[in-house]
Amino acid sequence: MGTRLLCWAAICLLGADHTGAGVSQSLRHKVAKKGKDVALRYDPISGHNALYWYRQSLGQGLEFPIYFQGKDAADKSGLPRDRFSAQRSEGSISTLKFQRTQQGDLAVYLCASSS
């Protein structure tokens, strides 16, 4: 893959109820050159207060790095804080940002929300 970094953003919804509501994601996948900045965005179903970012590296199990209850985050990722950040506005859109991407950032990134 050379100097390209492939980050997939996918949606995984938690919960058994079907509300007929929609989910919005900014990109189905994102390809970035090594060293570039990347932002993944997730717009959860209205009324979902809890939001979870997951990461799955090639050949690894699912990791649970970041959790939001409302706009307050609990970061258990161990990801370098100087290069990674997650934000969520007033119970709404969440953005996961990567600065100066590296080969080790290659993974599937998923976001889920629940009420």
Curated annotation (Swiss-Prot):
A Pfam family per the record: V-set
Domain of life: Eukaryota
Coiled coil segments of this chain: none
GO terms (BP aspect): adaptive immune response; cell surface receptor signaling pathway
Location(s) in or outside the cell: Cell membrane
InterPro entries in the record: Ig-like_dom_sf, Ig-like_fold, Ig_V-set, TCR_beta_variable
Main subcellular localisation: membrane
Gene Ontology cellular component list: plasma membrane; T cell receptor complex
Quaternary structure and partners: Most probably, the alpha-beta TR is not assembled due to incorrect folding of the beta chain. Alpha-beta TR is a heterodimer composed of an alpha and beta chain; disulfide-linked. The alpha-beta TR is associated with the transmembrane signaling CD3 coreceptor proteins to form the TR-CD3 (TcR or TCR). The assembly of alpha-beta TR heterodimers with CD3 occurs in the endoplasmic reticulum where a single alpha-beta TR heterodimer associates with one CD3D-CD3E heterodimer, one CD3G-CD3E heterodimer and one CD247 homodimer forming a stable octameric structure.
Entry function: Probable non-functional open reading frame (ORF) of V region of the variable domain of T cell receptor (TR) beta chain. Non-functional ORF generally cannot participate in the synthesis of a productive T cell receptor (TR) chain due to altered V-(D)-J or switch recombination and/or splicing site (at mRNA level) and/or conserved amino acid change (protein level). Alpha-beta T cell receptors are antigen specific receptors which are essential to the immune response and are present on the cell surface of T lymphocytes.
Record protein name field: Probable non-functional T cell receptor beta variable 7-1
Source organism per UniProt: Homo sapiens
Gene name for this UniProt entry: TRBV7-1
